[in-house]
């Protein structure tokens, strides 16, 4: 991206959330296209080669962008910190462009869903012991 974006936490806390009304298919496509475009622009700087970005709607209505490709560990980072930062950037950029907040999850080859399953399994086993 050639433009500099001023990143500010206040952007993510705007009162212009879209939670009141569901988005039309065209609006959802625009949100997805905007987020994917921003993600592709940022991925150029990681030199990860050819990647595929799958988009789908999560259980809670969020837009999930799942990146697949070869040797993507650099996108996850230590304890998922790089992936969290990437998700934050994509959310901020998308909010700036579309004008309202829409939940976006950036994942790498299902990393976040695997981590969630591990945590749920640990919680169940801890609950049984208690």
Language model: regions and residue ranges:
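RNA-contacting regions in translation and RNA-metabolism proteins
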Residues: 1-130
